[in-house]
A protein has these predicted regions:
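Pair of pore-lining "gating" transmembrane helices in MFS-fold secondary transporters
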Residues: 1-14, 91, 95-96
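Small/hydrophobic positions within alpha-helical transmembrane segments
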Residues: 9, 39, 43, 47, ...
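Conserved extracellular-gate-facing transmembrane-helix segments in secondary transporters
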Residues: 9-18, 101, 136
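Loop-to-transmembrane helix entry
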Residues: 27-46, 123, 127
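Transmembrane alpha-helices of Major Facilitator/SLC transporters
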Residues: 36-60, 74
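C-terminal transmembrane helical hairpin of 12-TM major facilitator-type secondary transporters
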Residues: 62-106
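A late C-terminal transmembrane helix in Major Facilitator Superfamily
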Residues: 101, 109-152, 159-160
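Multi-pass alpha-helical transporter architecture, strongest
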Residues: 160-183
Length: 183
């Protein structure tokens, strides 16, 4: 449950950067163009992969707690960037989002592997990924719809508030959950 909702939030937060980067980065940063938006996405993915590699020895629950916490913080930084247009905050947002993204991807797959038996592994992994893919789609559609009424900046602020509260709540639930032993 927590792993799948973690995937939802992880994919949703990355989806915001990926799908709306050209639009909102043009408003927040003094630099423009496809290279800037492409660079932010590349930074998230490269740093995410690096964090996953470095975090391999960490306990899964540690990865979940830190990952969700960093995703919440990344949304706070992105909201602050949206309101202030300060590029340093955007860099902090990218770094914390990338670290949270990597930790949650590592932890999510690890949790699926821990709770699945050989007979249920493919179904559980598919379900986990489907929830993640819905997380890529639904929040972005909501931001697009909301931006028609409030403007893009306020839609991003609303997204950041929601995702910060959501990932913080998941972090608290994960903290309360006992450690999962392999099936």
């Amino acid at each position: 449950f927590i792993a799948s909702l973690g995937a939802f939030s992880t994919f949703g937060i990355f989806g915001l950067y990926a799908s709306l980067a050209p639009s909102f980065m043009g408003q927040m940063l003094p630099w423009h163009g496809p290279a800037v938006s492409g660079m932010s996405i590349a930074v998230i993915l490269f740093l995410s992969a690096g964090v996953q590699w470095l975090a391999r020895p960490l306990h899964t629950k540690t990865c979940v707690l830190w990952g969700l916490g960093l995703l919440a913080l990344g949304n706070v930084w992105l909201m602050a960037t949206t309101l202030s247009n300060w590029p340093v905050l955007f860099i902090l947002s990218l770094l914390t989002t990338a670290a949270g993204h990597g930790l949650m991807n590592l932890a999510g797959i690890a949790i699926v592997n821990k709770v699945a038996t050989p007979a249920t592994r493919s179904g559980l992994l598919s379900t986990y990924l489907i929830v993640g893919y819905i997380g890529t789609i639904a929040p972005i559609l909501a931001v697009g719809w909301l931006s028609d009424y409030t403007g893009l900046s306020w839609a991003i602020v609303a997204f950041c508030i929601f995702m910060s509260v959501f990932t913080s709540s998941l972090c608290w639930l994960a903290y309360q959950t006992p450690v999962i032993e392999p099936a």
